[in-house]
Amino acid sequence: MIIQDLASFIEGNIIGKDSFFDDEGFTGRFTFLNDAIDGDIVIRHKINDKGVEIAASKNLACLITQNPQDGACDKAIELNFPLIIVDKIELATAYALKWTIEKFSPDSKNVIITGTNGKSTTSHLIYHILKNTESHVLTNTDSESEFNTLIDPMVSKLISDEVKNNGKLDYLVIEVSEVQGWLGNLMKHHAYLMASAVKPCVGVITNIAMDHIGLVNSIDEVFDEINQVPNAIGDGVTVLNYDDDLVMKLTPNNPFLCSMNKFDSKNPHVYYDDGIFYEGNLILENNDLPFTSHHFIQNILSAVAACISLDIDIKNIVEGVKSYRPLNRRFSKLHENPLIVDDFAHNPDGIKATIAETYKLLPKNQTLYVVCSIRGSRGVEINKLNVEALVESMNDNIKLVL
C-alpha cells in the first residue's frame, strides 16, 4: 500500500512528505502514539506539534488526524513527516479495522452486536460460549465499556496484538455502538460503517430505543442509524429481537428470530417459555439460566441464536450458558440479605427494566430503595429522560435516592 491509496480510502489530504516516512513504508499496525513502534500508523482525533515530533522520532509510517492543532501542520512540513488530515476520523478507524482483520485474522468467523441495550452482555455471553468450545476468541466487550466505541484504533490494536502474542483467531466478537459521535457531532451511519469493516457472518440487533440524546433527537433517527446494519451483514445471519417493533421493521436477507413469547405468526426460531426452546425443543431450563430478569433473558436468547447460526453444537451452547458469569454491573447481586443489586442501566428503557425486575425479587410489601447517580457528562436531555423513567417506575413501596 502507498500513502496516496491510504489517503484516498479515508478521504484525507497529505501534509508534509508525500510518502510513508520510512522508505520501507507501512510495515506495522494501526495503534496509539504511546504504544507505537517503527513502521506503525497512529490515528488520533487531535494532534499538536509535539505529537508530530514524537511520531517522527519513533519512525512511524504516518499520522492520521481530524484536528491538527498548535502548529502540527507546520511541524509536519518542517520534519518532512507525512500527516494525513481527514474530515471524518471514523473513516480512518473503519479502514484500520478492515485492514487489520484482513491482515491478521482473515479466516476468522466474525460476529457483530449492536442495538441500544444489551450489547455488552450479549457480546460477552457469545464470547464465553465460543471460548468454552476451546476456540481462540477475541471480543472488544469489557465491563467498563471502554473498547466498544470503535472511534479510535483500540480494537485494531487488540486484534493485531492478540494474533501476534497468541496465534490465529477462530472468532471475532465485536460490539458496535448503535449511535456514535465526537465533540457533540454525530458520526452518521457509524454502526453500518464499522459492521461493514468487520464483514460479519452473523450479526445481532438487540433493540432500538432512545439514548445518546444530542447526537440523535428522536427514535426515528436511532432507527436510521441501525437500519443499514443488515446491509453490512449481507447474506450472513441477522439475529433479531422479535419483541421489538422497530427491530422487526428491519429487512435483513437472512433473519433469525428470537422472542420472549412462544406463539407467534412468524414462529421465532428461539423463544422463552419458562426455559429456552429451539425449534420447539427445550434446551435450557429456567434453573440453568445465569439471569432471571426479562431483559437479560432476551440477551441470552440472542446469544444462543448467534451461536446456533455459527453452527455451534447445542450441547456446547448449553454448557456455555450454564457456566456463564455476568460482567460486573450487569444486574449483579452484591448482597443477599439485604438484597443489593448493581446495574449499569443508563437510558430510560434500561432503568425501567432494572427497577421492574429488581422489584419482582422483593418479598411482598418490602421497600425497594433505588439509588441512582445522574452523570452530567451524559447531557441534559438524556438525564431528563432518565429522571422521568425513574419517576414513572415509582410506587408506594419504592423510594428514590438521587
Regions found by a protein language model. Give the residues of each.
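Short internal beta-strands
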Residues: 61-68, 204-207, 239-243, 369-372, ...
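Short, conserved loop/helix-junction motifs that constitute active-site signature segments
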Residues: 55-59, 76-78, 195-199, 229-234, ...
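Phosphate-binding loop of NTP-binding sites
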Residues: 92-240, 246-254
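Active-site beta-alpha connecting loops in nucleotide-dependent enzymes
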Residues: 47-53, 327, 357-402
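Glycine-rich phosphate/pyrophosphate-binding beta-alpha loops
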Residues: 47-49, 326-329, 342-353
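Acidic, Mg2+-coordinating active-site environments of NTP-dependent enzymes
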Residues: 72-74, 165-169, 173, 199-340, ...
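Active-site glycine- and acidic-residue-rich loops that bind
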Residues: 148, 152, 179-186, 342-352, ...
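N-terminal leader/targeting and accessory segments in enzymes
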Residues: 1-95, 99, 292
